[in-house]
Amino acid sequence: MMLRSAGGSIRRAITQRQNQHRFYRPGHGVFGHLPDPPKRVFENQGGLTPENAQRVHLINAFRRYGYLEADLDPLGLRKVESVAELDPAIYGLSLDENVKGNFSLHDLAEQLRHIYCGPTAIEFMHINNWEERQWISQNFENCIAEELRKEELLRIGDLMLKCENFDKFLSTKFPTLKRYGAEGAESMFAFFSELFEGAAEKQVEEIIIGIAHRGRLNLLTQLMDFPPVHMFRKIKGRAEFPESADAAGDVLSHLVSSFDYKGSEGNVHVTMLPNPSHLEAVNPVAMGKARARAWSMNKGDYSPDERSARAGDSVLNVLVHGDGAFTGQGVVWESIALSQAPHFRLGGTVHLVTNNQIAFTAESSVGRSSTHCTDIAKAFEYPVIHVNGDHPEEVVKATRLALAYRERFRKDVFINLVCFRRWGHNELDDPTFTSPVMYKEVEARESVPRLFLDRLVEEGFTTEEAVKEQLQKHTEQLNNELKKVDSTVPIDISHRGRWEGFKQAPKAIESWDTGVATDLLRFIGAGSVKVPEDFDTHKHLYKMHIDSRMQKMQTGEGIDWATAEAMAFGSILLEGNDVRISGQDVGRGTFCHRHAMMVDQSTDHIHIPLNELVEEQKNQLEVANNLLSEEAILGFEWGFSSENPRRLCIWEAQFGDFFNGAQIIIDTFLASAESKWLTSSGLTMLLPHGFDGAGPEHSSCRMERFLQLCDSREDQTPVDGENVNMRVANPTTSAQYFHLLRRQVVPNYRKPLIVVGPKILLRHPKAASTINEFGPGTTYQNVISEEHATSSQKIKKVIFVSGKHWINVEKARDERGLKDSVAIVRVEMLCPFPVVDLQAVLKKYPGAQDFVWSQEEPRNAGAWSFVRPRFENALGVRLKFAGRPELAWTATAIGEHHTKEAEEVINQTFA
């Protein structure tokens, strides 16, 4: 193995000055969350009078209930029932009475019905904020009256024509292709066209899009400059990546692109994210990516300008949903719940729900319990704009209103595009088996683009000849692209932008020098507990945390887990990298060990010492305590980590057992993203683990599941290299943990890291390290073996363990007087499997005849099933098992049983 230098000078980093201030100021909120502007107070502009009270009630009734009578269904299947509250008579009003001049109450009612019950409707009266309601009512009413210009109508018509033609082209050239086309929902491209144009006009610099399969290929080729030839290559079975790339690829409907949109009033960079087939899973990923982009740009919550900056400046997140998944998937609720949370807010996401009124074969009547698929938005007081998909021009208006609302209030806004699906879930599926009535209507009607273009022709905006000419030209372009398939090679789009200079991990194992000068570590350690003079610190923290750490820095002895972490964070910051740690209790730590943020006991103000190590510190630690969610949070953090490699992103579970609430994210992003999409991530998961008698859900991070997800070879031919899909480590000392964290940012490649984290080791003296174990020339040890007072040739038995179990095994061995004949080897890195390190250890014990794998976990859990074949195949060692018997869950909750099991594990180990 080659020892490599981290490169760069931390000393130089300390002296670097930042052009702009960007550090935490006491009393102004923590880094990553700007204080909210003061709420505006509105004076009463005049109350109701006896003369107008009932009319106002009628107006507000249309604003509140008008959407229930709106003309939203392009198929005409939805029965619109009369809403009693919209009848003027119940307010004691007569249609004949005059409102003003010749304007009668009948005229008022008709006007209200035209505005609030047409092909565009809105829900907003559930919002508590008076200013928002007033703004929406005024702007919506103006929006409905707006007329689009000729060039805007023609742009929409041309775009939808091309989208429809693209679907027809694919169906002709590739009749067995599942393309998940946009037919029936072509109005969604009026949304995207206006979104890009409007965002550029509002000085948005970056748009991050999360979208599933429906209409994705159309969006890529017709609006996002994705070369159709590359799509045709994929359809023909060719790889989307160069042969040199270490990747397996993904399905056609998960292709991605990014491009620069050049609008009439400005430009905006648009990025579509890769996604799995697990619908809505991309939502939090896109949110995390968007927020991370704001940090990289020093915008929004990360801006040094606290006076004028607002969350959402320069970066816009856009999520496109399907009606069935939007209603049914729990990650939707979790993600929206994050939308205004500190350290997660984006300043408003624009949501488009492509509501084709059916999910696979489930129609809306069985697909949800609510009136509309977007009703979830009302729980968070977000407005919903409903639009009939047969009216693309109304979609443009709705998009303008949504962008304006988001710009003004920096909150999420939803557009419910009610449309239909021309074919089945895919084009090879027959939907008439289960939805015959719906599909009679679908088959009997013209397409959305055709209806819209007929209107444009009828109104004199274009001619049928011009439409045919445009159609022919577009078909020729697609045919020309198809002809180039055999002569076109794929383009490597990985490691660009902020990832420039990074690469895929090598196939060999590397060892990097992750040590740091000890005088600097003492400086960081002391700085990590430094508080302002007027800060009212909790009395117990002085002795347990501050004084204790200062003593450790003076003696260089007994450095515990939290101190090692603080030194790792501080050194990473001073080397020019940012750090973000999120989780439900990460500021303090579930086990009250971290205290990265301290709370003033008099004012509740928060102080993060690591953000003030040096004056005008360039890089920052964001401590993100979050809501009780796993899937959305882990997805958010994965998206965050994929945006910038010079940022250590960590998610810590409250207990390791709770990770499986995020299993979809782990399976489809964390473990597989690089292989599928060449998307790298250095996300680190800290999963507290250990059998201490706490019972199920508080004992195991199920390391076996992560090991099963690793692409490590059982036969170890070749042996594992750095190119495994993720690293799984079970460190036993604070220094080991320190080196693990630093290794996540030192190399020029990134891999996810799963840390089987400790609980009792956090403060255990045997897990503590000396300052020299962190110094220059030190690195992570994949395997830790013992130094023996007598000859290692006398060793007859070798016990392999992983994690804190070694303390129990060592104690039992020494009590049995077996120290001279039994060796204990700690396997600290499970994946990549450390074959070379273990070979070196085994050579130390030529007389050993008995090899045991001892673990706390049941036989069907822990590392056993992973290490056993690798020991046999790569090392020629047949291991005996010592551990708990197979169990249907992780651990017993009966104290007596736990104690008895623990004794039995030790007895097996030394049998």
UniProtKB/Swiss-Prot annotation:
Keyword Protein biosynthesis (UniProt): no
Main location as per UniProt: mitochondrion
Gene3D superfamilies the UniProt entry points to: 3.40.50.12470, 3.40.50.970, Multifunctional 2-oxoglutarate metabolism enzyme, C-terminal domain, TPP helical domain
Keywords carried by this UniProt record: Glycolysis, Mitochondrion, Oxidoreductase, Thiamine pyrophosphate, Transit peptide
Enzyme Commission number, as recorded: 1.2.4.-
SMART domains membership: Transket_pyr
Superkingdom of origin: Eukaryota
Keyword Iron-sulfur: no
Names of required cofactors: thiamine diphosphate
Pfam families: E1_dh, OxoGdeHyase_C, Transket_pyr
Molecular-function annotations in GO: 2-oxoadipate dehydrogenase activity; oxoglutarate dehydrogenase (succinyl-transferring) activity; thiamine pyrophosphate binding
Location within or outside the cell: Mitochondrion
Any single GO CC term annotated in Swiss-Prot or TrEMBL for this entry: mitochondrion
PANTHER family attached to this UniProt entry: 2-OXOADIPATE DEHYDROGENASE COMPLEX COMPONENT E1, 2-OXOGLUTARATE DEHYDROGENASE
NCBIfam families on file: 2oxo_dh_E1, PRK09404.1, PRK12270.1
Function (record text): 2-oxoadipate dehydrogenase (E1a) component of the 2-oxoadipate dehydrogenase complex (OADHC). Participates in the first step, rate limiting for the overall conversion of 2-oxoadipate (alpha-ketoadipate) to glutaryl-CoA and CO(2) catalyzed by the whole OADHC. Catalyzes the irreversible decarboxylation of 2-oxoadipate via the thiamine diphosphate (ThDP) cofactor and subsequent transfer of the decarboxylated acyl intermediate on an oxidized dihydrolipoyl group that is covalently amidated to the E2 enzyme (dihydrolipoyllysine-residue succinyltransferase or DLST).
Family note: Belongs to the alpha-ketoglutarate dehydrogenase family.
Protein name: Probable 2-oxoadipate dehydrogenase complex component E1 homolog
Source organism (scientific name): Caenorhabditis elegans
Gene: ogdh-2
